């Protein structure tokens, strides 16, 4: 290791070694559209049940008439300074995509980029251990991985899962009349930006961490409810971005009750201090034309990039009580944030 390497693990603040944080590192939806516009002939496989057409949370491949294999990957730069916690959050976030399809994880492979001439290998070990801890909590093995020397720390997982095809949930299959539920509060981008700006108070340091370390394992149980018509997780594109994917995929309009959207404690306080991540502006620039006129305050909430955010559920009114009972049984507050209806305007999301 060079003389520029940090020798004391206690003095290392991982967020100072990256230009972005967590899912806020995501390439904006608009730029991503350009990247994915392939010039090659379209190749199809009838067994690929879910690919990239709807930008769903994971790919699903039909193994037989009953079982599908789910494949996904997610990785990003540090969103917290503690290496173990960073690894745990990154892994929890990656595993979430399996649950968002209604499946259960089977195993994971680690993805690690590390500036070996700037940061000790012992710190990378703690990051990987954090990922291993999340895998253990999900009941799976961290079965291997791949690493490269990179200018900034990067960590995540490639995760394989399985799903009973009768339980498969997608992000583009919602129906008019569905009610919208969110399983975690919004505001992770705001609080982690407060940390990066050194405004976060010590007593608030675990608010976002606790939310990001919570596995979305409830998704596998939600998927067994027949009246759940669509399911996705809310991550880097913010609540508005992922809700738009649901609306556009099903050709519906969301009637959103912004006052009902749950927020993390203290999120509004830090928002008032200007703690708005860059990803918020990139998100709005990418899809703001599909939203109603918003105040800066509303933009900051709806477009706030989440890392390891909650599940967004579209459920029929007939099955709503069953969903509420399930969430209550697992100590998740059931919060309805709106509904879906047949479009009456060009906006995909309207506020009520």
Swiss-Prot record:
Keywords: ATP-binding, Kinase, Magnesium, Metal-binding, Nucleotide-binding, Selenium, Transferase. GO terms for biological process: selenocysteine biosynthetic process. Pfam families: AIRS, AIRS_C. InterPro entries: PurM-like_C_dom, PurM-like_C_sf, PurM-like_N, PurM-like_N_sf, SelD_I, SPS/SelD. It comes from Shewanella sp. (strain MR-7). Its EC number is 2.7.9.3. The keyword Plastid does not apply. Homodimer. Its cofactor is Mg(2+). Gene3D superfamilies: PurM-like C-terminal domain (3.90.650.10), PurM-like, N-terminal domain (3.30.1330.10). The active site is at 23. It comes from the Bacteria. It catalyses: hydrogenselenide + ATP + H2O = selenophosphate + AMP + phosphate + 2 H(+). This is Selenide, water dikinase. ATP binds at residues 26, 54-56, 74, 97, 145-147. Mg(2+) binds at residues 57, 97, 233. Transmembrane segments: none annotated. The record marks 26 as: Important for catalytic activity. The keyword Ribosomal protein does not apply.
């Amino acid at each position: 290791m060079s003389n520029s390497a940090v020798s004391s693990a206690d003095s290392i603040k991982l967020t100072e070694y990256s230009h972005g944080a967590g899912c806020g590192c995501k390439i904006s939806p608009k730029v991503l559209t350009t990247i994915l516009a392939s010039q090659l002939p379209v190749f199809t496989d009838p067994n690929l049940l879910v690919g990239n057409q709807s930008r769903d949370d994971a790919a699903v491949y039909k193994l037989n008439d009953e079982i599908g294999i789910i494949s996904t990957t997610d990785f990003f730069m540090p969103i917290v300074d503690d290496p173990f916690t960073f690894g745990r959050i990154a892994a929890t976030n990656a595993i979430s995509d399996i649950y968002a399809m209604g499946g259960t994880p089977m195993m994971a492979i680690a993805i690690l980029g590390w500036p070996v001439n700037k940061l000790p290998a012992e710190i990378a070990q703690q990051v990987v251990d954090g990922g291993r801890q999340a895998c253990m909590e999900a009941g799976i093995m961290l079965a291997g991985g791949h690493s490269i020397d990179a200018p900034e720390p990067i960590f995540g997982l490639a995760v394989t899962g399985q799903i009973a095809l009768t339980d498969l949930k997608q992000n583009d299959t919602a129906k008019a009349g569905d009610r919208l539920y969110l399983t975690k509060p919004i505001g992770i981008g705001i609080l982690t930006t407060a940390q990066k700006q050194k405004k976060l108070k010590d007593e608030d340091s675990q608010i976002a961490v606790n939310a990001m370390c919570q596995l979305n394992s409830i998704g596998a149980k939600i998927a067994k409810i027949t009246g759940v018509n669509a399911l996705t997780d809310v991550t880097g594109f913010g609540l508005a971005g992922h809700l738009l994917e649901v609306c556009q995929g099903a050709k519906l309009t969301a009637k959103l009750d912004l006052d009902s959207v749950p927020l993390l404690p203290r999120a509004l306080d830090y928002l008032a201090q200007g703690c708005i991540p860059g990803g918020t502006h990139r998100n709005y620039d990418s899809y703001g034309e599909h939203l109603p006129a918003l105040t800066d305050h509303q933009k900051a909430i709806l477009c706030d990039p989440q890392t390891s955010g909650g599940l967004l559920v579209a459920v029929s009114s007939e099955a709503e009580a069953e969903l509420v009972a399930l969430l209550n049984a697992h100590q998740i507050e059931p919060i309805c944030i709106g509904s879906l209806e047949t479009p009456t305007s060009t906006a995909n999301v309207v506020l009520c």
